[in-house]
């Protein structure tokens, strides 16, 4: 499916979807905890490497994700349904307040790793560019597959990574201003947006597999 490259609404929707999936503000306490023992310069390096890795992972998903599905014989509509279910499960954990606890558990399993290793694993993947963000990116790439659309979606990915970088750079100040309560509220709002996106993915996939079912 191709659209006019001047239709900004689809790129805004893609950007909001990524932000809702990853919730950069909700990730701030995790980033602060994981880099607590790093110096100022080390923390900056971790932030840069992590978000560069996020861009690379999502770009690979954008341009080659559908080809990978074809290799394994997975239809895009089945993948849309599976991705939608995954996104809804993440949304449930965000709304119920379990999302941060889940991430902390993953972080705790990596505590014994060297500081230099946390930029890519587990920070870039799976905490930022996790299964939800990757599957969402692949789905968008199949919706709008012209080179012009993919190029603009690439710019959205770079913008998203830049926003994550900004959030992590401002982490100490954001924690002071919002506190845990403010961050939890934002996480729940993102969860509601995310659930809507997941339902849309599922309904589109079901509608394509079973034409007329949703009409």
Curated annotation (Swiss-Prot):
Compartment(s): Cell membrane
InterPro entries, A to Z: Multi_antbiot-R_MarC (IPR002771)
Membrane topology summary: Multi-pass membrane protein
Residue ranges crossing the lipid bilayer per the database entry: 14-34, 56-76, 81-101, 120-140, 150-170, 189-209
Similarity section: Belongs to the UPF0056 (MarC) family.
Coiled-coil intervals, chain numbering: none
GO cellular component: plasma membrane
Alphabetic keyword roster: Cell membrane, Membrane, Transmembrane, Transmembrane helix
One Pfam family this sequence matches: MarC
Species assigned in the record: Buchnera aphidicola subsp. Acyrthosiphon pisum (strain APS)
Major localization listed first in the record, in broad terms: membrane
Protein name (database record): UPF0056 membrane protein BU267
């Amino acid at each position: 499916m191709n659209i006019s490259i001047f239709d900004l609404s689809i790129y805004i929707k893609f950007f909001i979807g990524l932000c809702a999936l990853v919730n950069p503000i909700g990730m701030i306490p995790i980033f602060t905890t994981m880099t607590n023992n790093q110096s100022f310069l080390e923390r900056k390096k971790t932030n840069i490497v992590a978000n560069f890795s996020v861009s690379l992972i999502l770009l690979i998903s954008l341009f080659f994700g559908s080809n990978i599905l074809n290799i394994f014989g997975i239809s895009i509509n089945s993948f849309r349904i599976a991705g939608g279910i995954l996104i809804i499960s993440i949304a449930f954990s965000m709304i119920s307040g379990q999302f941060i606890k889940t991430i902390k558990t993953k972080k705790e399993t990596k505590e014994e790793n060297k500081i230099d290793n946390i930029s890519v694993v587990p920070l870039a993947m799976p905490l930022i560019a996790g299964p939800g963000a990757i599957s969402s990116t692949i789905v968008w790439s199949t919706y709008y597959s012209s080179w012009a659309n993919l190029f603009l979606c690439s710019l959205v990915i770079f913008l998203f990574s830049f926003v994550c970088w900004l959030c992590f750079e401002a982490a100490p100040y954001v924690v002071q201003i919002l506190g845990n309560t403010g961050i939890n509220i934002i996480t729940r709002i993102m969860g509601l947006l995310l659930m809507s996106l997941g339902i849309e993915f599922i309904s589109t996939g079901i509608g394509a597999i079973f034409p007329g079912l949703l009409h």
